[in-house]
Amino acid sequence: MASGSRWRPTPPPLLLLLLLALAARADGLEFGGGPGQWARYARWAGAASSGELSFSLRTNATRALLLYLDDGGDCDFLELLLVDGRLRLRFTLSCAEPATLQLDTPVADDRWHMVLLTRDARRTALAVDGEARAAEVRSKRREMQVASDLFVGGIPPDVRLSALTLSTVKYEPPFRGLLANLKLGERPPALLGSQGLRGATADPLCAPARNPCANGGLCTVLAPGEVGCDCSHTGFGGKFCSEEEHPMEGPAHLTLNSEVGSLLFSEGGAGRGGAGDVHQPTKGKEEFVATFKGNEFFCYDLSHNPIQSSTDEITLAFRTLQRNGLMLHTGKSADYVNLSLKSGAVWLVINLGSGAFEALVEPVNGKFNDNAWHDVRVTRNLRQHAGIGHAMVNKLHYLVTISVDGILTTTGYTQEDYTMLGSDDFFYIGGSPNTADLPGSPVSNNFMGCLKDVVYKNNDFKLELSRLAKEGDPKMKLQGDLSFRCEDVAALDPVTFESPEAFVALPRWSAKRTGSISLDFRTTEPNGLLLFSQGRRAGGGAGSHSSAQRADYFAMELLDGHLYLLLDMGSGGIKLRASSRKVNDGEWCHVDFQRDGRKGSISVNSRSTPFLATGDSEILDLESELYLGGLPEGGRVDLPLPPEVWTAALRAGYVGCVRDLFIDGRSRDLRGLAEAQGAVGVAPFCSRETLKQCASAPCRNGGVCREGWNRFICDCIGTGFLGRVCEREATVLSYDGSMYMKIMLPNAMHTEAEDVSLRFMSQRAYGLMMATTSRESADTLRLELDGGQMKLTVNLDCLRVGCAPSKGPETLFAGHKLNDNEWHTVRVVRRGKSLQLSVDNVTVEGQMAGAHMRLEFHNIETGIMTERRFISVVPSNFIGHLSGLVFNGQPYMDQCKDGDITYCELNARFGLRAIVADPVTFKSRSSYLALATLQAYASMHLFFQFKTTAPDGLLLFNSGNGNDFIVIELVKGYIHYVFDLGNGPSLMKGNSDKPVNDNQWHNVVVSRDPGNVHTLKIDSRTVTQHSNGARNLDLKGELYIGGLSKNMFSNLPKLVASRDGFQGCLASVDLNGRLPDLIADALHRIGQVERGCDGPSTTCTEESCANQGVCLQQWDGFTCDCTMTSYGGPVCNDPGTTYIFGKGGALITYTWPPNDRPSTRMDRLAVGFSTHQRSAVLVRVDSASGLGDYLQLHIDQGTVGVIFNVGTDDITIDEPNAIVSDGKYHVVRFTRSGGNATLQVDSWPVNERYPAGNFDNERLAIARQRIPYRLGRVVDEWLLDKGRQLTIFNSQAAIKIGGRDQGRPFQGQVSGLYYNGLKVLALAAESDPNVRTEGHLRLVGEGPSVLLSAETTATTLLADMATTIMETTTTMATTTTRRGRSPTLRDSTTQNTDDLLVASAECPSDDEDLEECEPSTGGELILPIITEDSLDPPPVATRSPFVPPPPTFYPFLTGVGATQDTLPPPAARRPPSGGPCQAERDDSDCEEPIEASGFASGEVFDSSLPPTDDEDFYTTFPLVTDRTTLLSPRKPAPRPNLRTDGATGAPGVLFAPSAPAPNLPAGKMNHRDPLQPLLENPPLGPGAPTSFEPRRPPPLRPGVTSAPGFPHLPTANPTGPGERGPPGAVEVIRESSSTTGMVVGIVAAAALCILILLYAMYKYRNRDEGSYQVDQSRNYISNSAQSNGAVVKEKAPAAPKTPSKAKKNKDKEYYV
């Protein structure tokens, strides 16, 4: 329909008068644009060869049909449309390609426009106002064949689609507006008929042939299809001027009639204008009209005056747009008369006890439901019939005649045996309480339209039923809101269900004992749920099979093009195919369902099929709404759907058109219901597009397009994509044999039909891909790899439900050699007993035995089958990749990833990841394992991965009976496979393109099929060999992995070259589908065989750390800083702790303890996520109540942005170029330093934000003018610190993840969140008491530990919190500690040695007008004394993690300084397993961490730079790695599969506290024993050190740092796992009310420093230049030629012992 309201012209008054006069003079018509509107003019003969058509129009419609003509459905047509407010002409001749003309002049502007259409043979021209264009058709014929009338503004509904050349024209929106001066050449055409128009000639009802006005009344059109008569000058009254001014009283309703039989009724019936013509009433006659809208009817009670007649007449007139409806019925049982409208034709059914007589009357063109008046007359007379044959001669029969409009006549004869029509029931007019139950009724719904002058006469009396109803006769009962005038009754508009998700909910259907439903539908799609309703279960659990717990249900569904009826009244269901042929042919199909108790019938296109429900129940108890077209998405899981309704389980909603829905004879306005419910995907019209939807190739990425109903359907199976057009990449999950995904459904599911599809890629020949499992039965549908084939197992636990026994699980096999590490597609289709298994479009079919078809399941599992209670053989775990799992329309993998469902559990990894499962290291050639005998008698499938630098070595050996054996070995860098099946040894060599001892992982597949074909595959290179003779490999003894004992090598067969074992790593070992744990399952383990695999590389390279992790070079290895990557693990390749935020939102809140809230000048935030949302809040950090500081990371319009406020205005930074709402994984990195900020998304360039101006200097300059001189310095310092608060994030109170509290909840994955040393997601996974979770959350797998690794503590935790401020206020003898600020690196760089005033961060006001701010613990100013650190560089300049220089200055610094308070809190501590530090804190082996201060830089600091202000320094250097922590050495507890390559080296000045660290005064120098370098490798946690990402365009490479080789210098050793403090380092300033002791201490410390420096200089100048002390225990490096992938040295040197407490004062060393 064209948009807009009803057309209302609004021209100026004078112009309006002129135009109205013009329109009246030119017979102008007003088109209302309503449904069913049309105008029909005489044929335009000039269109054949040459002619003109012109008219004027005025409209505001943008799309509508103006003109149409054609040749009657063959080839030629001409169509003039309004499209986008402009005229478009299409025409063709002789089936040529249609020509199209589109004019540019807009005409939908409420102005008058002149249109001229000119035909000239093959050429047609169109002109509007001053614009004209022409087009020509390239056809064989010159003339256009014109057979139709000229249609204007719409197509009459009686014109069939088959009679239209261009069928789509019937569904174009009708024209809305004014049309005048229509001429064909110079003459106006004759208007043959119209509907829905206003104007002088809008309706032929006023034409002389049909003028209803009598006695000279003036006919006028009052409304579409309704006329009125002006009787003012006729002397008559009434609606049609047929009544005298003083009419006589009407006769009694029951009058005797002396006229009988043949005197009253002629054989042919009265024609138009005869006695029966209601449109030509006699003088004094009044018409009686009533309007019926589907729920109204009236009935006359005949119980007191029963009918016994032999001659009858029924007359009435009707007007309707409806195709079906009951007009009149009387009688019951064997005597009845029924007159109905069915499919637009008049049906008559008469039964006098001797069998029904049926008559059908149809018009030649169109239908009777054309909203025009039609007269019906039915007569029954006694006649003598001279029939053919002896039995019919001279017999009396009753002649039945039915005529419509006096022209169309049908006759027939009834038998003479029953001559009387007897009825003592009711005369129903317009409907009945239950039309479907009336005997002989061909329809089940009531009439909708107008009925006029319904009269019944027989030889005894006359019943004027319409008059009696209007006058309210006591024997006449009225039902519904009857209106006794003819009103327009809109046709029941059809609706179109445009997608399978669309549906309309109808009120609950109360049809306990009887009920009827009729409707029309049309579609081209083979499957879909038409109707569904069900009751509640009779008790018991959802998982029970007991028939006592069945729920009643009623459904109609399309399956494979056939219509099925499904009905269950609680005692057994029936499933009946109601159509003998397919009904998805695109034509209208009429369905009529009627039920009475257990009996009933369903009729499809007048072909009826009876049914009888099983069981004894006759009550259909439905509780739910009656759903039309489909089911609501939200209720599909929670609603226990009956398994017999296959389309419900398959989520196959109906797509197509539905019209004329009647329930129990009452109409349902589908369009109104859809609009009231806001039904998505339900359109208020029905049209069938002729263009092929797939012609434009809409499916992307290789999707297969299929035609649907006015839509295309993209089959994305096998493409790796999902979505309507296969536009969205499907989620990939990686499995390593210990990983799974499990969908735990809220309720037990019972299905009889399943559609399953997925893609897989694996190198193993065995492994479970998908299985449905039940907690209560052995039911399963399982897909697994079995010997390189796809195996489908379907087991329906028939014994449990007591059904007829079956032969057990059904199995199907398809495909071969599917373990080729390529993507394959598998699909399973089950429909009851029928099975189909397809692999890469190759289909295998099977048929299940037994009558039981119901599959029960609670879970859908992938990777590992965890529900094992009812299976005897557990399938092997899967190693490989799965993608695109769709089970009955649900893409569970993607729903799980996106958080659309909350009932999934998984630890498999998202993304296509390299898989190395359960690696072990053979550290020497003499190491090996022995397992149980390899079972490889008839066939064999072996798979493993290896990595080594050794060119030779025995990988696998198993001997056997006789000469049988198998060997896999590495010879000169190539794999050899040697075997003997009894025919002598054979050798197969791998054909890899280069030696495989390159320290990279390689895949090896060795297989032998039952046909004795041997296959050796190295990575992607395959060698095959067929051996004749013996086919069985009879092995015995132990299977040796990695080597043999020395004395066995000499006894190996001659083709075996190995004389030594394998040195390197093995992983993912698969022995014929069995995944052994090489260490746990070993019968013997000889030598050094350990879990995990560490490569020989000990130096940083660009590939050392993945995902932009930063490589940190250590003394004997390297570590990776993963904090800003969202990943973890030794090389930043393991996913961080991941939570899935589901629908409805969720929230994770970390709350700092009130006394432990940090205030920061710098913040660092990194997080990974994936989502499809375009607006959400990811992370928000808030300050304490009243302060108003915050930081928020959010998604807006699909892009990432950050907004923060640290005391001034809101500051924003975003990345508008990176769209993150695409469902892919993205990593966001944000840093803040004061008001400066950087933001980076993935590998996009870093966005930087620097605020303009320096507010501090301007404020100080203004303030000094009003401050007394004597207070100037103190207030200057106070103001400076006050201004500094505008760059400090004060008193951080909580971190909130998920945005639920902000009203913008996030849905999707969040992974590896890192903020200022905190890993909140990991804390949440460990149930930290400071973390609270709420909403729909699910943890993916097992989250890594929140405790940072040893290396991380040294450089990450303290570096991130270097600017954390602790505010301390001291008054007299009382000390109160609050979150405040301490001197930092910047303080030590200023040249001002005056006392520093520390202002409270808790003061909520950043007042710039010098208002007094009173801290909570007092208002006095505390002036601490701070000792300055020297700016001179240390003697040894070490390299720190790369920090990008700021734009202005090239040199940069790395500040080093920390205290013990920077460590995580004791609540977060995790005791080390077997660690040495379990004793008391004063134990000599459990040293406290030592603070290290100073500068370390990769560049020499230029001391000539001008001194910088405190604020200016941080503005210039926004990214600074501030400090590191030195700890006492300790032996770590071993952890498998973790890199243990050493510790961070960071030499610097050492300060040893003489008291516990919390009491260490700022600047005080203490002494401690120097730390020895660690010889043992410290344990690594899941985290890694932090480093800021360098600012450079993508792609970003990991930063590489290195450490100088000074083994004798003290090394910064990482924190052990047992030593943890609060998350975030804190500097503590101790202040005193008296400064005397501080001054004395400073002087003494300075003197001591000078003495030490002089002594060191003296020793330096007098040292022996040719002698160096070197710690040989640390001075070694691996020789790659002598090492392999696992071993650096055969034996590590012993660690030097830590100096004992007795030697501390003796062996002290000091470094400055």
Swiss-Prot record:
Subcellular location: Presynaptic cell membrane
A Pfam family that the UniProt record links to this protein: Laminin_G_2
Listed GO biological process terms: adult behavior; chemical synaptic transmission; gephyrin clustering involved in postsynaptic density assembly; neuroligin clustering involved in postsynaptic membrane assembly; neuron cell-cell adhesion; neurotransmitter secretion; postsynaptic density protein 95 clustering; postsynaptic membrane assembly
Residue pairs linked by disulfide bridges in the UniProt entry: 206-219, 213-229, 231-241, 450-486, 657-686, 694-705, 699-714, 716-726, 1065-1093, 1100-1111, 1105-1120, 1122-1132
Entry PTM: O-glycosylated; contains heparan sulfate. Heparan sulfate attachment is required for synapse development by mediating interactions with neuroligins.
PROSITE patterns: EGF_3, LAM_G_DOMAIN
Sites carrying sugar chains: 60, 338, 841, 1236, 1400
Region entry Disordered, spans: 1373-1392, 1458-1489, 1525-1626, 1679-1712
SUPFAM superfamilies attached to this UniProt entry: Concanavalin A-like lectins/glucanases
Cytoplasmic topological domain: 1658-1712
Record's signal peptide: 1-28
Transmembrane segments: 1637-1657
Positions with a binding annotation for Ca(2+) 2: 779, 796, 854
Residues binding Ca(2+) 1: 335, 352, 420
Gene Ontology terms: cellular component: cell projection; glutamatergic synapse; plasma membrane; presynaptic membrane; protein-containing complex
Domain of life, per lineage: Eukaryota
All residue ranges annotated as the EGF-like domain in the record: 202-242, 690-727, 1096-1133
Tissues of expression: Predominantly expressed in brain.
UniProt KW keywords: Calcium, Cell adhesion, Cell membrane, Cell projection, Disulfide bond, EGF-like domain, Glycoprotein, Heparan sulfate, Membrane, Metal-binding, Proteoglycan, Repeat, Signal, Synapse, Transmembrane, Transmembrane helix
Chain ranges of the Laminin G-like domain: 29-206, 289-486, 493-686, 732-904, 918-1093, 1137-1345
One GO molecular-function entry: metal ion binding
Family, similarity comment: Belongs to the neurexin family.
Protein function: Neuronal cell surface protein that may be involved in cell recognition and cell adhesion. May mediate intracellular signaling.
PANTHER family assigned to the protein according to its UniProt record, in alphabetical order: AXOTACTIN, PIKACHURIN-LIKE PROTEIN
Assembly with partners or alone: The laminin G-like domain 1 binds to NXPH1. Interacts with PATJ. Interacts with CBLN1, CBLN2 and, less avidly, with CBLN4. Specific isoforms bind neuroligins NLGN1, NLGN2 and NLGN3. Specific isoforms bind to alpha-dystroglycan. Interacts (via Laminin G-like 1 domain) with IGSF21 (Ig-like 1 domain) in a trans-interaction manner. Interacts with CLSTN3.
Stated name of the protein: Neurexin-2
Species this chain originates from: Homo sapiens (Human)
